[in-house]
Amino acid sequence: MFTARMARPMANESAPAASFAAPGSSGAPVADCLLEVRGVGKSFPGVVALDGVQFRVRRGTVHALMGENGAGKSTLMKIIAGVYTPDQGEILINGEPVVLSGPLDALDRGIAMIHQELNLMPYMTVAENIWIRREPKNRFGLIDHAALRRRTAALFERLSIDIDPEADVRTLTVASRQMVEIAKAVSFDSDVLIMDEPTSALTDKEVSHLFRIIRQLREQGKGIVYITHKMNELFEIADEFSVFRDGKYIGTHASTDVTRDDIIRMMVGREITQMFPKEDVPIGDVVLAVKNLGVDGVFRDVSFELRAGEILGVAGLVGSGRSNVAEALFGVVPATAGEIRIDGKPVRITTPAQAMKHGMAFLTEDRKDTGCFLNLDLLANMEAAVLSNRYVKFNFVRQAQLKRDCEAMSRMLRVKTPGLHEEIQNLSGGNQQKVLIGRWLLTQPRILILDEPTRGIDVGAKAEIHRLVSALAGKGVAVLMISSEMPEVLGMSDRVMVMHEGRMTGIVERKDADQVRIMDLASR
């Protein structure tokens, strides 16, 4: 999939704005161009997020947007969706310059955005969420619920979505909520749909369904903007792609004209020589031993050992119970069965505080809901896990030392930020993830549990985190790494534990692990 030959030489990556052209043409005709951005710039305090960028979406195409975290992708999409106002430049819709006053104005003009962090109302029904503020009314001016159900059912039939319109959103899986968001965007009959990392929490089957919907929309003449870090998705679904780097536009190409390595070079401005820098380090004594661990109704009979310096990967399909095991180990949801031993001694862990006293750290899979304090700054986020240990003396926090260590950690992890007092919600997803990793490294853990450590992170940041994890293992940290990305599991793990429907189905040594064997165990 990644061996497509270059059909023509790569364009100059630093080409000026005037040289922009759609792939395979000398410039898309205005009638073919649904949306165009010219010379758009946007700055925040201490940060130039976009520097005179350009972008174009053509009718009946899927246009992927690629770039490292912090490249400016999300900022540009929020400008197009009316969330932000650009400091300079212009936006053209169907060839006409427009000034968007807000998201509702963008919707009225045919632009809908499906955010990575879903924006549904959990205590409302599926139908109510889709048609909010547009509900059909009866002759008394009240909501016509029968018409609402019929309208939703017709929309779902059109998109081959099998979800009960009357179900409360809070009862749906993440994948089902994603489909509801897509249906809501389609319900506006928008010409341009922006999808931000839409497959980050989907199974392979759900991704295939999503791609069928995208192809259907493309055939209807819609323009799809598809933000992703996954190379295989770009080659499978995108007609063309644009790359941004450090707030600048780098180039646009047809997806058939480039290789995976070409795109990585455009994204990071350098070669990534080793994506999975797993070091051969001495494996020490057993640090964590788990026997017949279980949580009633969730998972059962999970047994494994984790040694100092070892990276134990955990694989399995979405819903297999991988994250639940991590939560039980860390005391988020205490185990109801089984035994946990640390350094050979049985321990009972019913709270995260108890887990931390035993030298554990836990990076959760959902940085928005269970990781970041979005309204607080980097310093507050990074220090959150250490305020009860070595930085507190006689009930006083050693603020100066803590700040110095947080600054050093931020530099080591190469967090892109104006300073420690920047609100974390203003950072890209990859930089937020680095801050959370830094939070736990400050606790100097002996056992590090990582749940989807590189989800939603660009290829350059992935390699950085892989190097960091490998280095930690080299220092004797025992790492339990849960990941839905098969190359990551195979490339980084000394052994791979596989789960299916709440059961552990096997543990495979690194030398014996391959995708076929892991998937066989994951589907038993």
UniProtKB/Swiss-Prot annotation:
Gene3D superfamilies to which the protein is assigned, alphabetical: P-loop containing nucleotide triphosphate hydrolases
Membrane-topology descriptor: Peripheral membrane protein
Primary residence: membrane
GO MF terms held by the record: ABC-type D-ribose transporter activity; ATP binding; ATP hydrolysis activity
Function summary: Part of an ABC transporter complex involved in carbohydrate import. Could be involved in ribose, galactose and/or methyl galactoside import. Responsible for energy coupling to the transport system.
Family indicated by similarity: Belongs to the ABC transporter superfamily. Carbohydrate importer 2 (CUT2) (TC 3.A.1.2) family.
Listed name of the protein: Putative ribose/galactose/methyl galactoside import ATP-binding protein 2
Originating organism: Burkholderia ambifaria (strain ATCC BAA-244 / DSM 16087 / CCUG 44356 / LMG 19182 / AMMD)
